[in-house]
């Protein structure tokens, strides 16, 4: 039953323009129902965002795929994720690259995500409880940075931690939000607006 729902979801994603086969294989390999509350597991393969507690959500599969595709990952890409959340996006990234660094400001979510990833034998992820606005400078620079919550403006620390040729994908804005794709070229940043989106806000600071 789960496999049938997964295949339906993958077909929907293809129809929405997701064509990267390596990405689609990663999506197929990650059991989304393991990242949501058991009471919502029947909705795990619907193409919609779902609550995960602490005022946070697990992103819509299309948005996970779209943002990941924009990163243009190769197996050796150095990746930073801001907002571990449930760990679902983290797991997708872990199937695509050799190592993922992920920062989560809410300690409980970080712990749960770390446990889920371990249960799925995804050991190529380093998680950290910290302020996502600050990134993870000691592990940078990064070829790709993905932010799963929306700051009102692009955090300077994340731009500084982006390597030459690197790509930063994030939602930006408060009431009206847009998905931005930022590429660093010759120490200049080219910002492209991709589409209108709706994410939870990227809050500064840490929460125990």
Swiss-Prot record:
A GO biological-process term: methylation
Keyword terms: Cytoplasm, Methyltransferase, S-adenosyl-L-methionine, Transferase
Residues annotated as catalytic: 59
GO cellular component, one term: cytoplasm
InterPro entries linked: PCMT, SAM-dependent_MTases_sf
SUPFAM superfamilies per the UniProt record, alphabetical: S-adenosyl-L-methionine-dependent methyltransferases
Top-level enzyme category: transferase
Pfam families: PCMT
Entry annotated with the keyword Lipid metabolism: no
CDD domains associated with the record: AdoMet_MTases
Catalytic reaction(s) noted: [protein]-L-isoaspartate + S-adenosyl-L-methionine = [protein]-L-isoaspartate alpha-methyl ester + S-adenosyl-L-homocysteine
PROSITE patterns: PCMT
EC id: 2.1.1.77
Primary localisation category: cytoplasm
Subcellular compartments: Cytoplasm
Family of this protein: Belongs to the methyltransferase superfamily. L-isoaspartyl/D-aspartyl protein methyltransferase family.
Role noted for this protein: Catalyzes the methyl esterification of L-isoaspartyl residues in peptides and proteins that result from spontaneous decomposition of normal L-aspartyl and L-asparaginyl residues. It plays a role in the repair and/or degradation of damaged proteins.
Protein name (Swiss-Prot/TrEMBL): Protein-L-isoaspartate O-methyltransferase
Source lineage: Bacteria, Pseudomonadati, Pseudomonadota, Gammaproteobacteria, Enterobacterales
